Amino acid sequence: MRDFVLGPIFLAIAAYGLAHPWVGIMGWTWLSIMNPHAYSWRLSSMPVAAAIAGATLLGLFLTPDRREFFVTRETVVLMLFMLWMCITLPFSYDFDHSYPLWNRVMKIDLMVLVAMCVLYSKKHIIMLAWVLAGSIGFFGVKGGLFTLATGGSYRVWGPANSYIEGNNEMALALIMIIPIIGFLRFTTNSIWTKRGLVVAMLLCAAAAIGSQSRGALLAIGAMTTVLWWRSDKKFFLAILLVVVGIALLSFMPESWWERMGTIGTYKEDTSAGGRINAWWMAWNLAKANFFGGGFAVAKAELFAMYAPDPTQVLAAHSIYFMVLGEHGFVGLFLFLMLWFFVWGSAARLRVQGKKLPQTLWLSYLGAMCQVSLAGYAVGGAFLSLSYYDLPYNILILVVLGCRWLDGKEWVTEEAEHAKQQAAIEAKSALKERSLRPYAKP
């Protein structure tokens, strides 16, 4: 049954993406973030994402419905980072395992660049935010209800065979999407939609807490701190956050509190000790190898050479040490520079967007993207999500928002809207005149 529902949807997206590549980008984002085809039977083993990506790339050259590629500091650094990963690939310690991972990352980054060519309007930006919110929010609403129904006794897991399959990764994705849902709440005028989005945000928070991820708890703390600091109503927001926090935490069982309590005693925790050991391995590996070790460095041989404790072979579990171990200090420098620039551009949107009523929505976009990135920066310090799609889609939102602001696109869009309205009114008037001879006296 799922195949019969999802199959026509995928075909329609691919077909429509040929004429309108922006539709293909929305479909690709939906597939890469939510992984819906994994819930079907036969479609789960078919290259659905590749088909939609191929149709989108072909449509990019066939249709004028696009903008010329524009150069920003973010796009330049992203392409340099991609180039550096291509340079480090031949020097990988385990090329056979590194190549599939490199191929996956290149596809994601390529579609990020394509998205910045075919998405340009306010409608595109808001629609992309809706796709992201719906894709992750689906798991948040479902997981939040599950957490409340079970009293937090069980962990919330992500979709299988995806970047966010684990409970920790799922929690970070949920935390990062909450500010994006908050931005969408500002863009809608429907009171019921606003209320529904508030409920979705609360359920996403419940699901993130229910994942029993210690990194997620730290990320929530970082996000709420940024949100509170930026608020004009700090006292009211502080009370609201405390009330909501107490309400959500009251559902958590004793096992949750015991696990969160290990944050302060990380030296006694074997899991934390294994991660620190992996971080030292990545540091020593990068010092000894200028190009890093490639995409697959969680190897016993490498830990034997570079780790303080060679018996604990674990992935880096940190976006920073992951890049450091895989691509060396140059790769880490480019990675940090990329997100530093994205943060700065989001700050510019937040400040400059307040100057005009037409750009006020961009101020909220920049502010919420910064809150989301704060969660990624803190929560990602304990997770291997350096190449996960969601933060790169936030990059797209920020870059497109800056382009819309700098190009004063609201002038063009308002003129286009007025032109369309005039055409509709003229068509209605013409139809009315054509019916007059047949009107009854």
Question: Which stretches of residues belong to each language-model region?
Answer:
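Transmembrane signal-anchor hairpin modules in multi-pass inner-membrane enzymes, especially those
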Residues: 1-87, 93-96, 100, 122-130, ...
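Juxtamembrane membrane-interface segments at transmembrane alpha-helix termini
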Residues: 37-45, 88-91, 112-119, 140-148, ...
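Short aromatic-rich membrane-water interface segments that cap or initiate transmembrane helices
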Residues: 37-41, 158-170, 270-274
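Membrane-interface catalytic loops of GT-C/OST-like multi-pass glycosylation enzymes that act
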Residues: 96, 167, 212-215, 314-318, ...
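Long extracytoplasmic/lumenal interhelical loops at the membrane interface
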Residues: 153, 157, 161, 264-327, ...
